């Protein structure tokens, strides 16, 4: 909910940067608190990758409000906590199923209130939402839970900075958006950061 309301008070590009910066900071903090070694080179790599996200998003930062920053930071912190929690899970599939079931039940009441006095809900919309949540999103969460336990939390946070780069690259292929020098530079920085901070 924070991400949905947050983007009403902050530009998409700026919100993206705030989100990934908070995720990265949260996962570095997790490593520190859990006494996981955090080599300086790994922190440098994380900062270089985050700089790549900054290069990608800065030109289109748009409107930035304190409320928008706060809500996207809360979203990033929540995802960092969810990621950190997954590091102790032995059965990613069962854990994700349980999480999604609890969330679905918790959202039934506000959805019912919204439907009763809000926008029209169609069968197609409900089916697509269910597929996106129960299939694509759930499978990606299971895969992420299974993979990220093999790397440090800091590295897990750094790896996630690839997502906005891949999204922008996909937009050039699928939506015909222009491939820019900034996108190339951002990609180079992100992947350079991953290489610098790679596990040794």
Put a short name on every predicted segment.
Residues 1, 24-28, 54, 77-80, ...:
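Hydrophobic/small/kink-forming positions within alpha-helical transmembrane segments
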Residues 1-2, 41-47, 67-75, 120-140, ...:
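Loop-to-transmembrane-helix transition segments
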Residues 1-19, 49-55, 133-151:
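Specific transmembrane alpha-helical segments of multi-pass solute transporters/efflux pumps
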Residues 3-5, 22-44, 54, 165-184:
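C-terminal transmembrane-helix exit sites in multi-pass transporters
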Residues 15-22, 85-105, 137-173:
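Helix-helix packing/entry segments at the starts of transmembrane helices
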Residues 38-58, 75, 107-108, 161-162, ...:
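Hydrophobic transmembrane alpha-helices of multi-pass small-molecule transport proteins
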């Amino acid at each position: 909910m924070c991400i949905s309301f947050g983007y009403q008070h902050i530009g998409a590009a700026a919100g993206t940067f705030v989100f990934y910066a908070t995720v990265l900071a949260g996962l570095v903090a997790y490593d520190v608190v859990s006494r996981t070694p955090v080599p300086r080179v790994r922190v440098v790599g994380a900062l270089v990758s985050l700089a790549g996200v900054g290069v990608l998003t800065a030109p289109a930062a748009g409107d930035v409000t304190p409320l928008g920053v706060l809500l996207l930071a809360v979203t990033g912190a929540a995802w960092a906590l969810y990621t950190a929690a997954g590091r102790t899970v032995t059965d990613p599939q069962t854990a994700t199923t349980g999480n999604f079931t609890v969330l679905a039940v918790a959202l039934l009441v506000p959805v019912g209130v919204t439907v009763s006095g809000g926008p029209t809900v169609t069968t197609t919309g409900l089916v697509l939402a269910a597929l996106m949540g129960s299939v694509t999103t759930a499978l990606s969460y299971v895969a992420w839970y299974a993979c990220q336990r093999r790397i440090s939390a800091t590295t897990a946070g750094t790896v996630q900075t690839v997502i906005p780069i891949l999204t922008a690259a996909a937009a050039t292929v699928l939506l015909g958006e222009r491939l820019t020098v900034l996108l190339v530079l951002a990609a180079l920085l992100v992947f350079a950061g991953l290489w610098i901070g790679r596990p040794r």
